[in-house]
Amino acid sequence: MKTPFTILAALTVATTLADVPDEWDIIELSFGEPTSVDSGEIKFAMCPKTECPNVESEEEFKAAIKAKRAKGKKVLLSIGGQNGQVQLKTTEARDKFVSSVGGIIDKYGLDGLDIDFEGHSLYLDQGDTDFKNPKTSVVVNLIAALKSLKEKYGKAFVLTMAPETFFVQLGYSSYGPSNGNDARAGSYLPVIHAMRDDLTVLQVQNYNSGPIIGLDDQYHNVGTPDFLIAMADMLKAGFPVAKTNNTFPPLREDQIAIGLPSTVSAGNGFVDEKGVQDALNCLMKGESCGTYKPRGGKSPSFRGLMAWSINWDKFSNWGFLNPHRKYLDSFP
């Protein structure tokens, strides 16, 4: 059975959940943040009334989550973001992460978790060169924590990840601190690889990124269909990490979504409606491709799109959601 096309998006608590259109399939509540960088304890709070006069009460919020889930939508807790650095350096922090995240999921009746670790949350120690057998504590402990949560909640647990390109596709040319490189380069790869059998969607942020080398060994820049195609194709085709003989295996096409800013103001790398749909046509049908030709073949079951964010799109009168929902729904 074919996986339905999906449109995902982050929702900050400044926007009322009950008012989110049902065309969004997966809603990621942003953000759960740590009490300190290395505590492992995650907190999630409603927007203060001083900032959000129309914010729901906690009971209204829980009811809205229940109503969305009753319609088949998935509501997740998104952890991290630009300001939410999380470093699970110790087993104590790992265990606190598991217990606190589980507590939030249980309290609100959520479907799962989105990992949006940015900044210096993940990195690789010197000598940690094999993504299949990581040694760095912040990586090893995150993997163990995610496996514990998956085991606790079972098959229905939804797990998504929203890394930046620096932590994923950059791993084709640079991995970890070897040769004087940034220790964070490619550091999501061991997490993705370890969780690939349990990963629902990988939605790499195709914005706020520097140029990235694709499988054609050419630099690609944000804001173009070629960038979207090249970055998604690396995940579908797989790639040799740091150009060695250690290959990151392909993900299933239904695990891959393209992360985009929903408006020009939401992030550097906005792509207009035609550009996004040209990229999807190329990936799914092998049509409308630009200079980059996918190595991974056609992906008719490609998962869809992720937007940052519902809030931004609301202020643009759903300029992202409406045309792309219609486009994806036009496929059989």
Curated annotation (Swiss-Prot):
One of its GO terms (molecular function) is chitin binding. It comes from the Eukaryota. The active site is at 118 (proton donor). Glycans are attached at residue 245. It catalyses: Random endo-hydrolysis of N-acetyl-beta-D-glucosaminide (1->4)-beta-linkages in chitin and chitodextrins. This is Probable class II chitinase ARB_00204. Residues 1-18 form the signal peptide. Residues 19-331 form the GH18 domain. The keyword Transcription regulation does not apply. Keywords: Carbohydrate metabolism, Chitin degradation, Glycoprotein, Glycosidase, Hydrolase, Polysaccharide degradation, Secreted, Signal. SUPFAM superfamilies: (Trans)glycosidases. It is found in: Secreted. One of its GO terms (biological process) is polysaccharide catabolic process. Degrades chitin and chitotriose. One of its GO terms (cellular component) is extracellular region. Transmembrane segments: none annotated. Its EC number is 3.2.1.14.
